[in-house]
Amino acid sequence: MNSTKENVFILGISCFYHDSAACLLQDGNIVAAAQEERFTRKKHDPRFPKHAIRYCLDEAGIDITDLSYLAYYDKPFLTFERLLMSYLTTAPRGLRSWLQSMPQWLGKKLHIPRVVRNETGYGGDVLFTEHHEAHAASAFYMSPLTRRRF
């Protein structure tokens, strides 16, 4: 685990679906967050959020090597299995959709650690969160209520 001045930096990213983004936490507090479309001017930009990542790191005054962790918003194999089962239950109706989505999955989503390393030079482990738990956690942690449920 890398850290700067005993700080824990966690970079969260989402990409290859819609609205790619990055968010940087320092010791559990949000330092910076940005959607890739703010830099590329492409609405709902699904590409790897390299500009958003650079912005977050620059805001904190750190480099990619200072990250303690990098987290991806989804567990690609879990989602891939769910999609496969969905397509199989609707076959052959879903064949066209399946064929359109597979290049994205096979080329990028199933290889997130490699994509992250190639795009950023990050050499640490990539952590994966369960997509719907990530949504629930964002509501939980941002709630102003003293008691939270999800």
Role assignments for model-derived ranges:
Residues 1-150:
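Short acidic/glycine-rich loops and adjacent helix/strand connectors
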